[in-house]
Amino acid sequence: MTNILDGKKLAKELELRLHEDITEFSPEVGRPPGLAVIRVGDDPASGIYVSNKEKACNRIGLDSFLYHLGTNTSEQEILEVIKALNNDQKVDGILLQLPLPKGLDAEPLLKAIDPEKDVDGLHTLNLGRLLKGEKGPRSCTPAGIMVLLRRNNISLVGKKVVVIGRSILVGKPMALMLQAANATVTVAHSKTINLPEITNQAEVLIVAAGIPQLIGLEHVRSNAVVVDVGIHRIPMEPLKLTGSNYKLCGDVRAEEIYSKIKAITPVPGGVGPMTVAMLMVNTVNRWQYHCGLSSTLSDLLP
């Protein structure tokens, strides 16, 4: 029977734990954790993601500060906001919501964030820490996947793991975290030749290609564990994308491979909730660090 790796359920458990930590330690340090989110422009998907993060903050008792800037905001204006947040003692974590509007380069903005407040794990220093195996904030999506696999007793030691995707958000940090867990890792991407030949070797297949329904029966070996990072809104009928005439899907054709595999993350309800949960974990962890508290979350930090 195929096991469903339920990220939504686990995320709720993590939120309860974080709420308990915040309730216990806030009186001691005089304030709850604080997360600042910078959103530039009015991308609808970004609006949904930011709303989900705000709701999670409210559930666990974390202060949320939203800076919603206009589409035409200059790089210098955003840098000024980041500088102010770096110096704000109420703020433990800073997140720059991506993607940015056309004409804005994320790289100098991410570099401007204080590495100790970089709860998305995208600062050059924190990526270097990950590469060297040093402690520091980790990218939320791959970190959430690692926790989800571990909580479902899926061992990675010596396992053949294939990661499809090489983005700085997911693919590259994912591969490094898997290597640190003693997996044997192969990274595939859009230029990979004969993808099924490679993915059929995977005992654990992590798909972060950003291509709807890319992976099907021909790509998976029997009893594989499949993690589907993608989420897409596609028409139920060609050229129609209005009202309820659409469906959500991932990078994997889940129904097609379901009977062949050992376990899979659902879309929605798998990786997405874990990404938000790990953002909360990172922020609370930074709060504990800034306030001189001992970390209570080391088991959740890859």
Swiss-Prot record:
GO cellular component: cytosol
Pfam families assigned to the protein according to its UniProt record, in alphabetical order: THF_DHG_CYH (PF00763), THF_DHG_CYH_C (PF02882)
Pathway: One-carbon metabolism; tetrahydrofolate interconversion
GO molecular function, one term: methylenetetrahydrofolate dehydrogenase (NADP+) activity
Sites where the protein binds NADP(+): 165-167, 190, 231
Catalysed reactions, semicolon-separated: (6R)-5,10-methylene-5,6,7,8-tetrahydrofolate + NADP(+) = (6R)-5,10-methenyltetrahydrofolate + NADPH; (6R)-5,10-methenyltetrahydrofolate + H2O = (6R)-10-formyltetrahydrofolate + H(+)
Annotated EC: 1.5.1.5, 3.5.4.9
Record family assignment: Belongs to the tetrahydrofolate dehydrogenase/cyclohydrolase family.
Role played: Catalyzes the oxidation of 5,10-methylenetetrahydrofolate to 5,10-methenyltetrahydrofolate and then the hydrolysis of 5,10-methenyltetrahydrofolate to 10-formyltetrahydrofolate.
Assembly with partners or alone: Homodimer.
Designated name of the protein: Bifunctional protein FolD
Organism expressing this protein natively: Prochlorococcus marinus (strain SARG / CCMP1375 / SS120)
This protein's encoding gene: folD
